[in-house]
Every structure is written in structure tokens, then in C-alpha cells.
Amino acid sequence: MSTPLDHSIRNPISSAEVPPELSENIILTSLDDIYNWARISSIYPLMYGTACCFIEFAAMIASRFDMERFGMFPRASPRQADLIILAGTLTMQMAVPTRRLYDQMPEPKYVIAMGACMITGGMFSADSPTALRGADKLLPIDVYIPGCPPRPEAILDAVTKLRKKIANESPQERQNLQQTHRFYSIAHQMRPAPPLHTGKYLLSETRQQPPQALAEVMGMNIPAFQSPEQQELLLQSGQQRELISREVDEAYKSSSKMY
């Protein structure tokens, strides 16, 4: 049985035309893009702050900045959060609890360091025996927000940069892109130190009566700064400070055993 010949070309040289009703209903993408699109639209930050910068983060919850338009809903449990914003000063005493919260967060998880104190130690980096000089010594930081304190607009800009970073990454490659030059772990060998300012310097003999060698160099007698009665009162106050410092040391040692 013969059939009529079909003179239409099945495989034309030119590109095939896609009907408009078909092009408006088909999207070409990959599973990674869909996965990242879902994650950037549902970033759940942890409600965690260590100092004053957290007040600026709390301002984002209000209607003026409205972080919920980014799909950000604050969570009180680290097991329900995938973003931790480190806001404020990180001390040696809070380093271990902060690391414990980070370990309890499910993968993939991200960290934003907010404020000068969290990035470099800030004004506490000069002579503070307890401040941590940068949170990147403890956790892998994804975005840094400089400022003292940063404005809520800067936090939104950091969230936008984090969303771009999430959109361009692959879940298979994230484990290979972890920082390797930091020592962010429990075994960071950082131990709390006893307080340095105990008031014992007030008991020094040369504090009230200059040393004899200084008087010989100057060629004149240097009188004492305090009278004997005042020195006796100062000695009593110094003994009280020493007693208080001992109580503080004992309380400090007992609290450090908890960690």
C-alpha cells in the first residue's frame, strides 16, 4: 500500500523554532541551581550575640529593614539554623560555647563575623588578656562586616553577598573549599589565664617611697608620697584587695572547670 510522500524536511539546517507557548513554560536548569535557589530563599540565622553589635542585628527584625523579605527567620536552636552571625566581642570564656553551637548546626552552614571586635579584637586587641583576636581563629568565616558597630544596611549587604556565594557554589565542592590555614577546632590550645590586675602593685614599697638609687642619680632627696598614716590605710586597703582577688581567682578556677 503506497503512502503519499512527505516533502517536509525532518532535520533542517537552520535551528528549530520554538513556539512561544512552549518557551514560556520551560526552564532549563540543574539540580544544584534548584538546591541553591531554595537555600538562598530560606536562610535561618541563629539568635546569638556576645556584645553590643547584636543590637544592630536585632534592628533588622523590625519593619524598617525587614530581613524576612530575604527569607530569613531567626531561630533559637542551632539545630534549626544554618547561619550564625558573630556579633560583638568573643572572649576566651565564650570561645568553647560558640564552637559548640557551630558544631550543632547542620550542614551546610555559614558564619558572618560582624564588627571590629569580632574580626580583629578591636579596641580589646591591645592589652586584653581575655579577648580573642579574630573569630577566624575559631570558626571558618564566610563574610566579614567591618565597623564599630556596623549599620543594619551593612548587614543586609553582607547577607546579599552570602546569597551570591551560596548561589554559585556546588554542594559537592563545599567540603573542598574549606579554609585550611586556620586552627578553628576544639584543640586550639587556647586556655583562660588568671587576671593580671589584682591590686598587688599597691603593696610595692617603691610605690610610696622612691628607691634610693633614683635619689642618688637625681642628687637630691625625694620625699615619700604618703604620710605613715596614709601608708597604713593604703596597706589595709591593699590587703583587702588581695583578699578579694583571691576570692575572684577561686571563683574563676571553679567556673573554668565547667568547660
Curated annotation (Swiss-Prot):
One of its GO terms (cellular component) is respiratory chain complex I. It comes from the Bacteria. Binds 1 [4Fe-4S] cluster. It is an enzyme of class 7 (translocase). One of its GO terms (molecular function) is 4 iron, 4 sulfur cluster binding. It holds the Pfam family Oxidored_q6. Its EC number is 7.1.1.-. It is found in: Cellular thylakoid membrane. [4Fe-4S] cluster binds at C52, C53, C117, C148. It is a peripheral membrane protein. Disulfide bonds: none annotated. GO terms for biological process: aerobic respiration; electron transport coupled proton transport; photosynthesis, light reaction. Belongs to the complex I 20 kDa subunit family. NCBIfam families: nuoB_fam, PRK06411.1. NDH-1 shuttles electrons from an unknown electron donor, via FMN and iron-sulfur (Fe-S) centers, to quinones in the respiratory and/or the photosynthetic chain. The immediate electron acceptor for the enzyme in this species is believed to be plastoquinone. Couples the redox reaction to proton translocation, and thus conserves the redox energy in a proton gradient. Cyanobacterial NDH-1 also plays a role in inorganic carbon-concentration. NDH-1 can be composed of about 15 different subunits; different subcomplexes with different compositions have been identified which probably have different functions. This is NAD(P)H-quinone oxidoreductase subunit K 2.
